Amino acid sequence: DIIIFERAIWKETAELSFSDSGGRQSTLLTGQRHIVQAVDIDTLLEDERVTYIKMDAEGAEMEALKGGKEQIKRNKPKLFIAAYHHDADIFLLPLFMWQLVPEYKVYLRKHPYVPAWELNFLAVV
């Protein structure tokens, strides 16, 4: 089943400020007035068994994964995570995945579509 929650996913439950200019210029800011409710995966889905997480959080992948670390440790879901927003994510994201689930096999995938810069990690047990 697919369930839609009108929330941002973050490392904790919080209120986040975003620019609402649209397109690629939408970004997390600290001084704007456009407030979005955020929640961590562990709180949002604490009574659920998560089996798959697909995430393109526009550069907030690490923070969002940190908010789901208990779900990831407990259920070892398949992960499909964007890897191209920050150069360091190529190294830091798989290290974090292995810290949570050492038996994850992590693959770097480049899909043949535009935009050409999109890289994703696939992690499976």
Language-model segments: residues:
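Phosphate/nucleotide-binding beta-alpha loop and adjacent structural elements of enzyme active sites
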Residues: 1-125
